[in-house]
Design a protein with these regions (language model features):
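Conserved glycine-rich Rossmann-like NAD(P)H-binding loop of the short-chain dehydrogenase/reductase
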Residues: 25-34
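C-terminal substrate-binding subdomain of Rossmann-fold SDR/epimerase-dehydratase oxidoreductases
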Residues: 186-308
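Catalytic helix-loop patch of NAD(P)-dependent Rossmann-fold dehydrogenases
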Residues: 78-93, 100, 105, 114-162, ...
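NAD(P)H-binding glycine-rich loop region in Rossmannoid oxidoreductase-like domains
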Residues: 48-86, 97
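Rossmann-fold cofactor-recognition segment
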Residues: 40-50
Length: 308
């Protein structure tokens, strides 16, 4: 089998590549933002906004994992039109390339942020969304991307799988994510800032557990299905700050006003993924944080005070 991974040089994408190679699957990384972290994969500097390049880059591929997107909600808020273009049109371009080259599957990276548009507090893959509740352009781009997958299946017969990620953490995290920010502040002697009262909860999912789901999603049972890939423990932002403080010390916590449109968290069930493709998270939050802090100190400890 030959697969392509858009965004394969990124935080999650690089771990997906690792898990695929562990299974001896041939991988082509499609990414114009950097180079792969390993040399046993093909690399094409493909821009997902360039349909011709994308068509050529996916020729001879069986399955494409589509992870390339504007994933930082702050960047989406700062540039909504550019984010809509990349996240929505980019997904359409990937689906069109799959149609052109008759790929066996498109596996889409989505997010539990889509449940911000659900009225229910306890949610699974079958809940309906209310457009009036999306609350953030990022949420809307992900719902639109999922809808395009369904449309391309209905209209053109392109099979898909949607993976709705919980909040990922672990080695290779982007510097702009909350855990690396907290770690830099802790070792820099600055207080960690927490939005609101810190009670916002997510089931943070360790990145290697998340990456495992991408291999399991190749199963025939996953075709044309959507799965929540979320952690097993409810973790508040305040607990993250307290954990970083415990592991790294620092000046403690400072509370600031909440962000507009922030996803407040839902009770997300991942039982469908456990039942149908055998996925469950294995790394608990404390163990994952210990690994993440160890990676951070090993790779960025000398430069953490002045990140690029």
């Amino acid at each position: 089998m030959r697969v392509a991974v858009t965004g394969g040089c990124g935080f999650i994408g690089s771990h997906v590549v690792d898990k695929l190679r562990d299974q001896q699957i041939d991988v082509r990384v499609l990414d114009n933002q950097g180079a792969p972290h390993r040399d046993d994969v093909d690399h094409v500097r493909a821009d997902i906004m360039d349909q011709g390049v994308l068509n050529e880059a996916t020729r001879g591929i069986d399955v494409v994992y589509h992870l390339a997107a504007v994933a930082d909600v702050n960047n989406v808020a700062a540039d909504p039109t550019g984010s809509v273009a990349l996240n929505v049109l980019g997904t359409a371009n990937v689906l069109e390339a799959a149609r052109t080259n008759q790929l066996r599957r498109v596996i889409l990276a989505s997010t539990v942020w889509v449940y911000g548009a659900a009225r229910e507090e306890r949610v699974d893959e079958g809940v309906c969304f209310d457009p009036a509740l999306t609350g953030h352009v990022y949420t809307t781009t992900k719902i639109a991307s999922e809808m395009l997958c369904h449309d391309y299946k209905t209209m053109y017969g392109v099979p898909f799988t949607v993976l709705r990620y919980g909040i990922p953490y672990g080695p290779r995290m982007r510097p702009s994510l909350v855990i690396p920010i907290f770690m830099r502040k802790a070792i820099g002697g600055e207080p960690m800032t927490v939005a609101g009262d810190g009670s916002q909860n997510r089931k943070f999912v360790y990145v290697e557990d998340l990456a495992d789901a991408h291999v399991l999603a190749l199963a025939p049972e996953a075709e044309n299905q959507t799965y929540n890939i979320d952690g097993s423990e409810e973790v508040t932002i305040l607990r993250i700050a307290e954990t970083v403080h415990r592991l790294l010390g620092g000046k403690g916590i400072e509370f600031v006003p909440a962000r507009t449109g922030d996803y407040g968290g839902k009770q997300v069930s991942s039982m469908k993924a456990a039942r149908e493709i055998g996925w469950t998270p294995k790394v608990n939050f404390d163990a994952g944080m210990e690994r993440t802090v160890a990676w951070f100190l090993e790779t960025q400890g000398q430069t953490a005070l002045n990140p690029a």
